[in-house]
């Protein structure tokens, strides 16, 4: 074990050259991946261990001991509160959309052959651009259950998850990872080009998956009875999204100095949900479960904010590509938090990588876990990889297309002080590599 010190940094114990912080963080993510029925407990225990380690050994960047912890929470509370309110609020928004009965109308437009299965994936892709990707995947799974007489191929389930993650990758309201970027100050336009890769990936995995499904169980064209769309609920969905976007634009354009002082975006969504409750009652019954899921994700995000990101590999397209494969095994939420803290990424490329990359294994994304709860047969890594092979191929092809079409253009730091901090951190990392002040037995 080595103990190294860099300028303006706390002591950073390492094991085999890797900071202990990262080993603890990796252990948490591995525990989440292995113990799917105890994810909240694993995340909270892991957070407690990392906080205790920081308190007793390394201290925080804002200082040692409890004062350092309080200082760190003062820096992060706005981001965490925003994320919590958006996760719960978008969960209620998704239920409004489902109850609008639009999902029951959409299958009417589908062709009778394999192209119908493909266009269903396109619908999921589009829904995910403005709904939470979890909701889009569940809606797609429900429509597939009806259209294919409950005989849904595992390869097609993988494609539904991939379509939902691809559709959310270029939209700041379509995926938790891109929403985190938005909250952190990244412009929505800086993630939009993720669709250059996501669109190609949808074609590459969607067509083989649709053919798989048609051979497994042909599409059943229903002559549905007349479905009455609840347009007031549709209006509520539009109003909530518009409120979030408008408040974010106003704060970041007119009052950028105040953006870190209050959770404006989250508060706008919560207010819009409450105001529109007089028009249609929200599905309050989902709130307890949404809060539980939000606490789990916030625990992982908070763990990520405690990591010494100055010791991570520099941001590059190779790193982003690798993070996509890592996100297939480890939750992409904390990976995104690490990248945001580090800075210097092409956010569109990163959004595509950690979003679509999580589709390669069923537990690599929240959408995959949610859909697999409805289709337990999908909870097999071997079967998912065997029948969903096209998702992995699509990820690589899509990323390549993104690099060819849009290129790699790292965004300038989106927060004041990040540039200077990055310079200091780089110098600290260089010094830490060259100088070990103390050597103790591992």
What name fits each language-model region?
Residues 240-345, 422-439:
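Transmembrane helical segments that form the transport core of multi-pass membrane transport proteins
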Residues 116-169, 180-184, 337-352, 377-380, ...:
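Hydrophobic transmembrane alpha-helices that form the pore/transport pathway of multi-pass ion
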Residues 76-89, 190-206, 264-265, 347-360:
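Alpha-helical transmembrane segments
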């Amino acid at each position: 074990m080595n103990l190294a010190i860099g300028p303006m940094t706390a002591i950073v114990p390492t094991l085999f050259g890797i900071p202990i912080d990262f080993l603890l963080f990796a252990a948490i993510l591995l525990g989440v991946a292995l113990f799917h029925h105890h994810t909240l407990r694993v995340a909270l225990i892991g957070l407690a261990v990392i906080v205790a380690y920081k308190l007793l050994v390394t201290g925080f960047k804002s200082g040692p001991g409890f004062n350092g912890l309080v200082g760190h929470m003062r820096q992060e509370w706005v981001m965490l509160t925003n994320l919590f309110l958006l996760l719960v609020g978008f969960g209620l928004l998704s239920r409004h959309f489902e109850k609008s009965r639009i999902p029951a109308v959409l299958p009417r437009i589908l062709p009778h052959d394999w192209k119908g299965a493909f266009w269903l994936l396109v619908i999921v892709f589009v829904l995910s651009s403005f709904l939470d990707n979890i909701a889009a995947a569940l809606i797609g799974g429900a429509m597939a259950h009806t259209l294919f007489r409950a005989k849904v191929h595992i390869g097609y389930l993988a494609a539904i998850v991939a379509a939902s993650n691809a559709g959310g990758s270029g939209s700041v309201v379509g995926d938790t990872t891109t929403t985190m970027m938005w909250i952190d100050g990244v412009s929505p336009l800086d993630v939009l080009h993720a669709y250059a890769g996501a669109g190609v990936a949808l074609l590459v995995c969607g067509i083989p998956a649709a053919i798989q499904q048609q051979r497994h169980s042909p599409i059943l064209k229903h002559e549905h009875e007349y479905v009455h769309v609840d347009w007031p609920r549709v209006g509520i969905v539009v109003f909530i999204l518009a409120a979030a976007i408008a408040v974010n634009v106003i704060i970041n354009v007119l009052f950028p100095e105040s953006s870190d002082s209050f959770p404006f975006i989250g508060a706008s969504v919560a207010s819009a949900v409450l105001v529109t409750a007089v028009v249609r009652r929200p599905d309050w019954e989902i709130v307890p479960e949404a809060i539980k899921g939000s606490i789990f994700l916030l625990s992982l995000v908070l763990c990520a904010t405690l990591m010494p990101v100055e010791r991570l590999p520099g941001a590059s397209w190779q790193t982003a590509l690798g993070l996509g494969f890592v996100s297939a095994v480890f939750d992409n939420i904390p990976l995104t938090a690490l990248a945001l803290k580090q800075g210097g990424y092409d956010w569109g490329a990163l959004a595509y990588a950690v979003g679509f990359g999580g589709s390669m294994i069923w537990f690599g994304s929240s959408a995959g876990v949610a859909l697999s709860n409805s289709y337990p047969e999908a909870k097999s890594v071997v079967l998912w990889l065997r029948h969903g092979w096209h998702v992995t191929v699509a990820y690589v092809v899509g990323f390549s297309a993104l690099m060819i079409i849009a290129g790699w253009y790292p965004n300038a730091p989106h927060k004041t002080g990040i540039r200077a901090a990055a310079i200091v951190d780089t110098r600290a990392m260089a010094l830490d590599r060259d100088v070990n002040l103390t050597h103790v037995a591992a």
